Amino acid sequence: MSTNRKNDMMVYCSFCGKNQEEVQKIIAGNNAFICNECVELAQEIIREELVEEVLADLSEVPKPIELLHILNHYVIGQDRAKRALAVAVYNHYKRINFHDTREESEDVDLQKSNILMIGPTGSGKTFLAQTLAKSLNVPFAIADATALTEAGYVGEDVENILLKLLQVADFNIERAERGIIYVDEIDKIAKKSENVSITRDVSGEGVQQALLKIIEGTVASVPPQGGRKHPQQEMIQVDTKNILFIVGGAFDGIEEIVKQRLGEKVIGFGQNNKAIDENSSYMQEIIAEDIQKFGIIPELIGRLPVFAALEQLTVDDLVRILKEPRNALVKQYQTLLSYDDVELEFDDEALQEIANKAIERKTGARGLRSIIEETMLDVMFEVPSQENVKLVRITKETVDGTDKPILETA
């Protein structure tokens, strides 16, 4: 209940001592009263403490070499991309700390360096971003660029990306404003041509323009209930200037653009180096000009100054992914069966066959789990009920479906 000035009995705030005539409202509780001014003060103190906690969490950002070490525990291969990401993430949070602690007289303004990751499906783009966010203990959200539309069209507004980050941060705005957002499949909203279209491009340039605003840094109005179905809802203001955006895509066919550019240079200058070599890695040669030619607007490219190119994973890479990282799939399934007191072994040839299947299906690392699930289905179904089974051995023939796994009993 609340009391106001019409009450005959004078009531005082238990915290500041003011009476109901000196404040707008006093709220009664169990044997205590609090005025609206003390409520507002308490809220402000809580907000300040939350900001301090967020800043304290990021005050000692791991050095690039430490971030690389963390990534190496979970991500196999992609050494150049991991180095680029480690440096970019370290500099990003160092920049935030600089802005939070610098004197007003300092005129150096460190600008944000968002990241563009280019690499084939299943090469580890999402997992890299996810691992970085987890290692820094910052909120992380994933968005699919193909689901976005510009304002006024049916689809998801770009502001909903920020809503996802807020949800992960339990609507702690200060914490969300220092999070990481990964926007996947940015290549799917590339312009259909380099020429500016007179007509509206719902799934291409318009979405890129909308993304540009939040990526470069703006105060965005985020609908807490999402979408456009609740026009009367009170918006949440989120400042995106300190949110790190990592944008990724496969960019299928961009190698041809790179080859064409390098080939022209060869003709023009008489060089006969890696531009002619079909076996060279053109992904590492990508520059802003190639990305623009692919269909990404130059303004957006300018807000993504850090390029991290990921290579197609080889059979050897995939085999290592299966067994080496801390969360390797082989270790996960061994742990699952260990709860039934059963050991699980994979022959080297079996792991090679799983990797070959993933490459044939063009699914990369993300397809490994589904292949193991197919291989392990009967084992996971039958073995828990067979008390005498102590070891399961997966062979190449088990993976290709020509034979059953080898079971050893007690």
Swiss-Prot record:
The keyword Transferase does not apply. Keywords: ATP-binding, Chaperone, Metal-binding, Nucleotide-binding, Zinc. Signal peptide: none annotated. ATP binds at residues 120-127. Residues 1-54 form the ClpX-type ZB domain. Pfam families: AAA_2 (PF07724), ClpB_D2-small (PF10431), zf-C4_ClpX (PF06689). Zn(2+) binds at residues 13, 16, 35, 38. Coiled coil: none annotated. GO terms for biological process: cell division; proteolysis involved in protein catabolic process. CDD domains: RecA-like_ClpX. GO terms for molecular function: ATP binding; ATP hydrolysis activity; ATP-dependent protein folding chaperone; protein dimerization activity; unfolded protein binding; zinc ion binding. The keyword Hydrolase does not apply. One of its GO terms (cellular component) is HslUV protease complex. Component of the ClpX-ClpP complex. Forms a hexameric ring that, in the presence of ATP, binds to fourteen ClpP subunits assembled into a disk-like structure with a central cavity, resembling the structure of eukaryotic proteasomes. NCBIfam families: clpX, PRK05342.1. Belongs to the ClpX chaperone family. ATP-dependent specificity component of the Clp protease. It directs the protease to specific substrates. Can perform chaperone functions in the absence of ClpP. This is ATP-dependent Clp protease ATP-binding subunit ClpX. It comes from Streptococcus pneumoniae serotype 4 (strain ATCC BAA-334 / TIGR4).
